[in-house]
Every structure is written in structure tokens, then in C-alpha cells.
Amino acid sequence: MTFLQRLQGLADNKICAFAWFVVRRFDEERVPQAAASMTFTTLLALVPVLTVMVAVASIFPVFDRWSDSFVSFVNQTIVPQGADMVFDYINAFREQANRLTAIGSVMLVVTSLMLIRTIDNTFNRIWRVNSQRPWMMQFLVYWALLTFGPLSLGVGISFMVGSVQDAALASGAPQWSGALRTAATLTFMTLLLWGLYRFVPNRFVPARQAFVGALATAFCLETARSLFTWYMGNFDGYRSIYGAFAAVPFFLLWLNLLWTLVLGGAVLTSSLSYWQGEAFRRGFDSRGRFDDVLKILLLLDAAQKEGKALPVQEFRRHINMGYDELGELLEKLARHGYIYSGRQGWVLKTGADSIELNELFKLFVYRPLPVERDHVNQAVDAVMMPCLQTLNMTLAEFDAQAKKQQQS
């Protein structure tokens, strides 16, 4: 077997082709640049976020111990071994932040919300979301992520760590305590990432796909942390150069790696919807989008006749495309008044006999320029005019014609 034949075999393999698709999306979304930006934002907002979380916990004394568990979890996750000095400084800054005035406290909250908003915008860009949540809904999501999310995680970590220690002592094998604690940390890291991937993007993300992406990312994070700790313990080049300040570059490198893995997990999660039906192999040209738009509208027309709305999952069962691409088409149709999103799902705004195919073609494939045009524009218009005239029919007429051709 020649090298080209082996290469073609890899391209035909579903797993290899999907992996290459994920790598391409990783590059298209410019994840390393986004991770660098998130690293800088985290440096500015980490202390305010921890301060706001602990301040909220102090309102309810019962949460004090659980908030400490979350801070400890952040220490283990964000600050690698060898950079412990950084977290000592963070704790010192957080304690000093408690002495701020009312205006200073407001600025802490604003800075914290800015970090959450940056995460939200980055995730929405990865899922290719063009429409934002309403302002009030955004605020509620941000506040929940900033307060109740960490507190819930702290509650879970406290119970899990306590159960692990009790189980290890009861079994007479305390040496297993470290492994069980790592498993507990991995579990809650997976839950935290699952919540981020499932609820932060303003896009439908299946729970199972969010879990797969979160689990893979959590394993990568735990492996990276172990390798990072091993490297810092065996190679002390930074220490010989920076001395006591070696913790700072270690911390920056780890933060950048952390965000690269988290955003890479988001890219993987958003790509998983293309696995079914090997949708990752299809091209994303204008003709394909126009065909998909017609399928969407025909499905909504059939649902309208039955008096029901269609959830996003229903479209995916009939159209071989990813949820992010599907969401883009639905949002564009909604912006131009063809459909709208209700509580039960998507609904057609008008009847199929009122939707002109040539208008859809102009919207998704080719729209003649309304302003002054040169000879090239005029020539293209002359070539496209017969096509637009052929498409001078309604969606209902097209549906009848398609069914007639299918029967013949």
C-alpha cells in the first residue's frame, strides 16, 4: 500500500476525518489568541471574582465552609504546584479587598461581570451565535455563574471530599485517599465544565455532547496539571533566572494552557453535533445553505398544518447539519420575518403560499446590487435573471412540484 493510499484511507476513516474537522475549527476560531486574551482578563478579574463569591457566601454563614472549599478547588485548578506563592498573594489581595468602600465594591462586581461577559462572548463566537440574550437574562446568567455556581460546587466538593476521607479511613486504606480525592476533583471539574458548555452559549447544546466535551477537557486538564508539576519539579531553568519571581511566569503559562484547553473543549463540544450522519464531511457553500433553508421552511410548514412548533432537535433529525450552522439559518430567517421562536420551539410566521423562492434565493445565495453597477455587475445580473425567473414561485408551489416529481 502506497503512502497516498494510506493517506486516503485515513481521510475516509470517520474518526480521523472528524478529528481533522475539529482541528480546522480550532484554527478557524483562533483559540490560542482567544486563550491569551482570556489569560489577561483573568489576571485582572480573578481577585474580584473570588472576593464577590466570598462576600455573597458571608451573607449566609452556613456557606462559609463551602466557599472555602471552592477557593481551595480554585487553588488546585488555577495555581499549579510550584506557583503557590501566587495564590498566597491572591488571598492577601482578596482580604484587603474586603476593606473597600461602597464604590470600590461596585467596581469589583463590575470587573467580575466583565470576566463572565468575556467568557460568554468567547463561547458564543465558538458556537457562532449572532443574537445575544436579552439584557436581563444575561444579567441573571452572569450572576448565577458568579455566585450560586461556585457555592454549589463548594457544597459538592465538601460532601465529596468528606465522603472520600470517611471511605478511605473506614476501609483501612488511607493511601487511597489521594487517588479518591483526585477522582472527586475530576468529577466536579467535569460538572463545572458541563455547566459552562451546556448553559453559557446562547445556542442549543445537547446535554450528552456537553458532558462528552467536559469529560475530555477535565481529563486533559488533570493530565496537563500533572505534566506541568513534573516539569517544574525536574527543570528549574526559570528558577535560576527569575529566582523568587519564578512563580509569576509559571502562573501565566499555566493560565494560558488552562484557557487553551477549556476553549479547545468548547470547540470539541460545538463540533460533536456534526458527528451524526458525518455532517462534518459536507461543504458549506451557498447552494447547500439554500437547500437547507427550504428544508427548514417545509418542516415548519408541515408542523404549522398540525398546529405545533418544532424544537431545534427536530430539525437535526431531518437535516444533516450541525447545531451551530442550523442556529445561524434559523436566526437569519427570524431576522427577516419568516419565522419566530416561541416557548415550544420555532414557528412559521406566515403561510407557505406567501413565501417567494426568488426572495429566499436573493437572501441566501445572490442578491442584485441596488446601487450603481459596472459592466461586470450588469453581466452577472443578466446571467442570473433566468434563474430568478425560474424561482418565481411560492414555497407551497415548490412543495407540490417536489412531491409530484417524487411520485413520478
Swiss-Prot record:
**Primary place of residence?**
membrane
Which keywords does the record carry?
Cell inner membrane, Cell membrane, Membrane, Transmembrane, Transmembrane helix
Topological relation to the membrane, as annotated: Multi-pass membrane protein
Q: Tell me where on the tree of life, at the top rank, the source sits.
A: Bacteria
Tell me a GO cellular component: plasma membrane
User: Is Transmembrane helix there in the keyword field?
Assistant: yes
Tell me yes or no: is Repeat among this UniProt entry's keywords: no
Q: Where in the cell is it found?
A: Cell inner membrane
* InterPro entries with a match to the protein in the record: UPF0761_bac, Virul_fac_BrkB
**Transmembrane regions listed in the UniProt entry:** 43-63, 100-120, 139-159, 176-196, 210-230, 248-268
Q: Could you tell me which PANTHER family the record lists for this protein? A: INNER MEMBRANE PROTEIN YHJD (PTHR30213), UPF0761 MEMBRANE PROTEIN YIHY (PTHR30213:SF0)
Q: Which NCBIfam families match?
A: PRK04214.1, yihY_not_rbn
Query: So what family is this one in?
Result: Belongs to the UPF0761 family.
What is the protein's name according to its record?
UPF0761 membrane protein NMCC_0461
Native organism is Neisseria meningitidis serogroup C (strain 053442)
Instruction: Cite the source lineage.
Output: Bacteria, Pseudomonadati, Pseudomonadota, Betaproteobacteria, Neisseriales
